[in-house]
Amino acid sequence: MNEAIMTIYTADCRENAMNTLYPRKVTITCTDDLAKAAAYDHVCAEYAGNRRSNSAFRCADCLPLDLDNSHSENPADWKTLDDVNATFPGVGYYAVPSRNHMKEKDGKAARPRYHLYFPIDPVTDAAEYRRMKEYMLAMFPYFDDKAKDAARFLFGVKGAQAEFMGGDIE
């Protein structure tokens, strides 16, 4: 299985929702690259001045989506990476358990939670980038529907582990 190349930008911090500066460009060529980078708060787009905002969006070659399993309290309804693979057969993507993977959150039972990274051809229009996320949500409505804008960041995960799933991307 060939892993895909994509670019993310990291901050110098972890779990800082107020941060908007992502100065470190990281080219992801394998799971080890992503595991190291995902230890820090990060974005999957380039922004003018390295400052995250919708208006500063410049380019992205990765579509990040969250699989939080917030759609149901019934464990039998929770979705797994196998469900993602079945919905997008042959599509390669990276998966990193989120910082709240298998932990109680907001009084709700522990459940599988993942950050998924789909490498894409470069996109330079924020509206098109959002439409791509909306398309993915239409195909798999279990992704977090609040994470569609072009300025979405992902919290870093201490001890992040990454997997390449689903297939080959040439």
Predicted regions and their residues:
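Signature for HUH/AEP ssDNA processing cores
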Residues: M1-Y114, F118-R131
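Epigenetic mark-reader domains in eukaryotic nuclear proteins
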Residues: R14, I169-E170
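A common structural junction motif
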Residues: F88-G92, E134-D144
